[in-house]
Amino acid sequence: RVFDSSQIPGHIKDLTIVNTETLRDNPALGKALVGAWFELMAEMGTDSEEGQKARAFLGGASATDQAGYEAQLAGMKMFWQPADAIAFIGSDEAYEAMDSVRQFSFEKGLLGEGADSPDFVGIAMPDGKTLGDTANIKLRFDTEYMQMAADGAL
């Protein structure tokens, strides 16, 4: 069997990454991005005409068609609602997946020169836990804007 991402559930994420200072200085950007994301999720997750059109468009953009894209979606863990995304990123499963990703990244030399262990970089999780170096945080999982979306407060 050819390797595909279904063999490592929870390890590959569709997410938007924004520089921490940029987001801090421009909170409207965070609101707009998260709002647009979940607006699209709401549309894509339905069998409405708009949902079908969105999946057909994204299928074409993914070098396949609507059926091929829907087959890909069927093999993925999708977070159609903000509350589902919040629950996942705060879970032990997400913590373990991020630990696995950083271990893999270190083993493959993806953490850069000078990385002497998987702890070289830090990953901040939403519950306040950190994987790796707390003085060298390079990735933060922050649920603030997802919570706003869940609360209808964007």
Predicted regions located by residue number:
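Short, structured secondary-structure boundary patches
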Residues: 4-7, 21-25, 130-140
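Conserved C-terminal helix/tail region of periplasmic/extracytoplasmic solute-binding proteins
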Residues: 102-154
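A generic structural micro-environment signature
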Residues: 8-9, 24, 29, 126, ...
